[in-house]
Amino acid sequence: MNNLGRHILAEIYGCDELILNDKEYIERIMVDSALKSGAEVREVAFHKFSPQGVSGVVIISESHLTIHTWPELGYAAVDVFTCGDRVNPWDACNYMGEKLNAKNITATEVKRGIFEQPVAVKASNE
C-alpha cells in the first residue's frame, strides 16, 4: 500500500515549566529537530502567550512540525508530518522529547494519503 507521508502525533509530559515557556528555546529545538531528521527548513513562526505558553510551526519542504505548550502542566502537544521516505519524523520527535526533558512521551504514527493504487500527480497547467 502506498502513502504520501507519515504524521507523528506526540503527547509530551513531565517537561520543565521554564523550558516550555521559553519561546526562543522552543523555536531553536524545533528547527534543530527538523534539521536533525534531514528535513529542509523553509519558514518558522512562533508566538509567546500571556501569561504562559508557546505555539509554533516550522514549515519544511517535506511538510511541517508544530508545537503547543502548557508550561503549568509540563505538557507539550507536538505534530511532525513528513512526506516521502527521505526524512524520518521519529528522529525529530525523539529529539524534541529529549530537549524538553520529558519524563513521558506517548506518540502515534498515522499514515497520510493512503492509496491502494499508485497515484499520478498532474501539473496544474494541464
From Swiss-Prot:
Location of the active site: S63 (schiff-base intermediate with substrate), H68 (proton acceptor), C83 (proton donor)
Protein task: Catalyzes the decarboxylation of S-adenosylmethionine to S-adenosylmethioninamine (dcAdoMet), the propylamine donor required for the synthesis of the polyamines spermine and spermidine from the diamine putrescine.
Cofactor: binding details: Binds 1 pyruvoyl group covalently per subunit.
Cofactors: pyruvate
Signal peptide range in chain numbering: none
Residues annotated with Pyruvic acid (Ser) modification: S63
Top-level taxon of origin: Bacteria
Pathway: Amine and polyamine biosynthesis; S-adenosylmethioninamine biosynthesis; S-adenosylmethioninamine from S-adenosyl-L-methionine: step 1/1
GO biological process: spermidine biosynthetic process
Family matches, as PANTHER family: S-ADENOSYLMETHIONINE DECARBOXYLASE PROENZYME
The organism of origin for this protein: Clostridium tetani (strain Massachusetts / E88)
Record field: catalytic activity: S-adenosyl-L-methionine + H(+) = S-adenosyl 3-(methylsulfanyl)propylamine + CO2
Quaternary state and interactors: Heterotetramer of two alpha and two beta chains arranged as a dimer of alpha/beta heterodimers.
SUPFAM superfamilies: S-adenosylmethionine decarboxylase
GO CC terms: cytosol
Similarity remark: Belongs to the prokaryotic AdoMetDC family. Type 1 subfamily.
EC number: 4.1.1.50
PTM annotation, UniProt: Is synthesized initially as an inactive proenzyme. Formation of the active enzyme involves a self-maturation process in which the active site pyruvoyl group is generated from an internal serine residue via an autocatalytic post-translational modification. Two non-identical subunits are generated from the proenzyme in this reaction, and the pyruvate is formed at the N-terminus of the alpha chain, which is derived from the carboxyl end of the proenzyme.
Protein name, as recorded: S-adenosylmethionine decarboxylase proenzyme
